[in-house]
Amino acid sequence: MMQDLINYFLSYPEVLKKLKNREACLIGFSSNETETIIKAYNDYHLSSPTTREWDG
């Protein structure tokens, strides 16, 4: 699931910008949940390529 979100964010950077600015939230998720997901994405995106592994 997270890899799908990452691919989506990479394909639609304007959506990611709106989510980061709290102008929108992911369907089915609260604004707090969306913020947590965006933080996880940012942490993943800023991490070293050798540490980019998801448990799920």
Curated annotation (Swiss-Prot):
A Gene Ontology biological process term: establishment of competence for transformation
Coiled coil: none
Main location: secreted
Pfam families: ComX (PF05952)
Propeptide, chain numbering: 1-50
Superkingdom field: Bacteria
Name of this protein: ComX pheromone
Organism: Bacillus mojavensis
Originating gene: comX
